[in-house]
């Protein structure tokens, strides 16, 4: 199963966020160059919200113009199930997500049709870090 461990932090303003990124302690563990990724995100669900009812999230995100479909499912603590597909069509992506280990029920739900429930556009600034020998992206 795919697994994501995520901890989100908040900064009071852009200047504070820039200061964190430039901090010597961050620079000491940064192993990759800073990158900017333009993202357009749409969340998808069935008309009766069956995906959300299972506490799953089905998302189509465009990252610098490339489509990425993701399904996330509940997990323990900060962890959760997560699978990604870079297929262009929802049908192909769902088939691949299930093949990768996402719940098989997703195919049945998506076959009944899904539509956009909400969305957002943003710019992500990211860099790879190595913490205690573990690569973090």
Placement of each model-derived feature along the sequence:
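Phosphate-end processing signature that detects enzymes handling 5′-triphosphorylated RNA
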Residues: 1-137
């Amino acid at each position: 199963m795919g697994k994501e461990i995520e901890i989100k932090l908040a900064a009071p303003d852009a200047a504070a966020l820039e200061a964190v990124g430039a901090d010597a302690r961050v620079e000491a563990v940064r192993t990759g160059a800073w990158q900017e990724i333009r993202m357009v995100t749409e969340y998808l669900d069935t008309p009766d919200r069956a995906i959300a009812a299972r506490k799953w999230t089905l998302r189509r995100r465009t990252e610098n113009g490339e489509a990425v479909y993701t399904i996330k499912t509940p997990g323990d603590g900060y962890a959760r199930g997560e699978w990604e597909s870079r297929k262009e069509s929802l049908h192909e992506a769902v088939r691949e997500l299930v093949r990768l280990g996402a719940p098989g029920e997703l195919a049945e739900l998506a076959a009944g049709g899904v539509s956009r429930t909400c969305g957002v556009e943003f710019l992500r600034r990211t860099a790879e870090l190595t913490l205690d020998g573990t690569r973090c992206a």
